[in-house]
Amino acid sequence: MKQDVILVLDCGATNVRAIAVDRQGKIVARASTANASDIAAENSAWHQWSLDAILQRFADCCRSLSSALSECVVRGITVTTFGVDGALVDAQGKLLYPVISWKCPRTAAVMETIERFISPRQLQTLSGVGAFSFNTLYKLVWLKENHPRLLEQAHCWLFISSLINHRLTGEFTTDITMAGTSQLLDIHQRDFSPEILQATGLARRLFPRIVEAGAPIGTLQTDAARLLGLPAGVPVISAGHDTQFALFGAGAQQGEPVLSSGTWEILMVRSGQVDTSLLSQYPGSTCELDSQSGLYNPGMQWLASGVLEWVRKLLWTPETPWQTLIDEARAIPAGAEGVRMQCDLLACQNAGWQGVTLNTTRGHFYRAALEGLTAQLQRNLRTLEKIGHFNATELLLVGGGSRNALWNQIKANQLDIPIKVLDDAETTVAGAAMFGWYGVGEFSSPEQARAQVNYQYRYFWPQTEPEIIEGV
């Protein structure tokens, strides 16, 4: 008997993947190929995406899975991508201008001068989204100022997930989780903001019908089915921005903060209410729409493992195993014997170490970095609790930084709450598949789909004794 699966097409900045997931959230088959942006013809410093190349990469992945998928029934397809990017298209869905990449610097000047139209504070209060130069709003203003005729000619703007969905189904739609990253919404109304659109001279007609996560978009058309090597007629279900599905796929409940720990740490929560008027007071803050109606995802981000990479390169070598650094830091007591580190190496003039003596070792420096980053997390968690109106009783940790057991224990001790570590790296795919199963009618809600998954967490409890982490 063939196995039912949801096929998740995930377009990341560095990889394009096709992953088949069963009803219990287990991965049945997967394929991946490298993804990369292209240099724009107009300017060698500019970056853009080739939609045709991305679709061909999906096709390569799906075709490499043909043997595994021949044993499966693909019940539905969902598409997840990074946020903000998209393109203007004509009535046939043909791109009028290439997809400007989030890596492209051309929109930075628009962000710096957005006050010509609307104050940055009002913009964040309405949209929730922080001032990041890659925001969709700045792309559209750039296009309006540099290619005004294209906006007049355009049938609509499609976010990158919707560009892919259009190629699959022929339908023009807007994934709500993608719109939530755009800086164009009134986040409390869950719709495009008349005030932002009017201030910037953008027409509401540019944005096609909004679809909620888990809603059917259409079915796989013949040409797309032939390209992917799949049967035509498979339902395509709305997903969208990877972050929202990673939160849901990690098992996060409402009011449970999630820390994605990597080069940057991104702290978010699924909250029933949010005070967006507070956001502009905190650099690096943002708020996106949750995958489920009625919830918000306020969050903050800061450089984290990027600081630790710098410390390793400075005091060891870039190739030194992390365990060497961890072992040296573990030998130093909590508080690093008075050595402290201000870890904001990007913006703070006082960044660096204090309290250094002739007895200070590099283990002190690394331990102080771990404790300094944890202090930064503690401040940001308190801020997020205020913005999102919740009280954290535990912290769910995902990402590469969660493999550092010493750092996990320091977090538990300094925050004085349990740290819950999920080792499964495929949270985005898991979350999107749950909405896919709901969308094809297999479950009555995404939560019921999630309840089929057996999550395995490791806990780090607050300790007053020195770190006891052997065997973890």
UniProtKB/Swiss-Prot annotation:
Keyword Kinase: yes
Cellular compartments per GO CC: cytosol
Pathway given in the UniProt record: Carbohydrate degradation; L-fucose degradation; L-lactaldehyde and glycerone phosphate from L-fucose: step 2/3
Domain of life per record: Bacteria
Signal peptide: none
Keyword set, alphabetical order: ATP-binding, Carbohydrate metabolism, Fucose metabolism, Kinase, Nucleotide-binding, Transferase
EC numbers, comma separated: 2.7.1.51
InterPro entries: ATPase_NBD (IPR043129), Carb_kinase_FGGY (IPR000577), Carb_kinase_FGGY_CS (IPR018483), FGGY_C (IPR018485), FGGY_Carb_Kinase (IPR050406), FGGY_N (IPR018484), Fuculokinase (IPR013450)
Pfam families, A to Z: FGGY_C (PF02782), FGGY_N (PF00370)
Cofactor field: a divalent metal cation
Family: Belongs to the FGGY kinase family.
Function: Catalyzes the phosphorylation of L-fuculose.
Protein name, entry field: L-fuculokinase
Organism name: Salmonella typhimurium (strain LT2 / SGSC1412 / ATCC 700720)
